[in-house]
């Protein structure tokens, strides 16, 4: 019988990390929101800790944190 896959590790992006990633990319809230495809209100709620990014948004933020220049280039902002 095949072994079960381990449960995925829940990794969440802290509100301070969202803001730090945006600063690293040198983007305003408005520009960053457009760049990642969310509303400014959503981005503000992430940065204020009222909500947390999940799914693709969280993955994009993690990638942007590790490779900001690549993300800017891919998203046409470099």
Give each language-model segment a name.
Residues 32-33, 43-46:
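Conserved hydrophobic/aromatic packing and binding residues within compact polymer-binding modules
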Residues 50-62:
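Short, basic-rich loop-to-helix N-cap that marks the start of a DNA-contacting helix
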Residues 1-13, 69-78:
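N-terminal flexible/basic segments that precede or flank functional cores
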Residues 63-69:
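Basic, Lys/Arg-enriched C-terminal extension of HTH/homeodomain DNA-binding domains
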Residues 14-17, 56:
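N-terminal positioning helix adjacent to the helix-turn-helix/winged-helix DNA-binding module
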Residues 18-31:
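Short basic helix-loop element that most often maps to the first helix and adjoining turn
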Residues 23, 37, 48:
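Residue-level detection of the helix-turn-helix DNA-binding "recognition helix"
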